[in-house]
């Protein structure tokens, strides 16, 4: 199993996004994925998942969730 990487952010740190769609937005680190080097920032990088209905009486839906971003795309504030 690969060893986790040392990252420059910790859970609870306030960070600013420096690249991507959410550039210049700020948020708090809520989770760290050390094996991939990605972090989850509260209120940043929302993605949508479309779910088809399973039966005719069922209704499809669109779920919104926060996706992780690479730690190199943020800086501490």
Swiss-Prot record:
GO terms for cellular component: chloroplast; ribonucleoprotein complex; ribosome. Its main location: plastid. The keyword Phosphoprotein does not apply. SMART domains: KOW. PROSITE patterns: RIBOSOMAL_L24 (PS01108). InterPro entries: KOW, Rib_uL2_dom2, Ribosomal_uL24, Ribosomal_uL24_CS, Ribosomal_uL24_KOW, Translation_prot_SH3-like_sf. Belongs to the universal ribosomal protein uL24 family. PANTHER family: MITOCHONDRIAL RIBOSOMAL PROTEIN L24 (PTHR12903). This is Large ribosomal subunit protein uL24c. It comes from Thalassiosira pseudonana. The gene is rpl24.
């Amino acid at each position: 199993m690969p060893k986790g990487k040392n990252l420059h952010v910790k859970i609870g740190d306030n960070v600013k996004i420096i690249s991507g769609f959410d550039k210049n937005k700020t948020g708090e680190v809520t989770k760290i994925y050390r094996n991939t080097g990605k972090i989850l920032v509260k209120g940043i990088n929302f993605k949508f998942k479309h779910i088809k209905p399973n039966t005719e009486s069922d209704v499809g839906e669109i779920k919104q969730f926060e996706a992780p971003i690479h730690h190199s795309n943020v800086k501490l504030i």
